[in-house]
Amino acid sequence: MVHMHITAWALGLILFFVAYSLYSAGRKGKGVHMGLRLMYIIIIVTGVWLYLDQTIVDKSYHMWYGLKMLAGILVIAGMEMVLVKMSKNKATGAFWGLFIIALVAVFYLGLKLPIGWQVF
């Protein structure tokens, strides 16, 4: 399940930047944006599954995985708001900030917690 979650995140980030570049070029990115929304669902379902699986086995990291899930949802919210505001030609600065800060938090927690790679 971890590999499916990581693959979904990788595809989600790729689709996000493709949709962003399409909207930036003035072309329609609606199809890519809808594909990205499908990836959001897969990311959330696999993330909840991993959260429940890990907290049933080991309750000592329950809070940290909860914070990681919250940060992951903020990443998804930031990605979606950036694309929606881009499609309407509105300012996206605050949502880029949300996206980047939450993404850094998710990567840090993902590399620190026991399920992820042990870098820190």
UniProtKB/Swiss-Prot annotation:
Provide the alphabetized UniProt keywords.
Answer: Cell membrane, Membrane, Transmembrane, Transmembrane helix
Q: Which InterPro entries match?
A: UPF0344
Presence of the UniProt keyword Signal in the record: no
What domain of life does the UniProt record list for this protein's source? Bacteria
Q: Which family does it belong to?
A: Belongs to the UPF0344 family.
Task: List, alphabetically, the HAMAP family matched.
Answer: UPF0344
What's the name of the protein? UPF0344 protein BCAH187_A1308
Q: Which organism is it from?
A: Bacillus cereus (strain AH187)
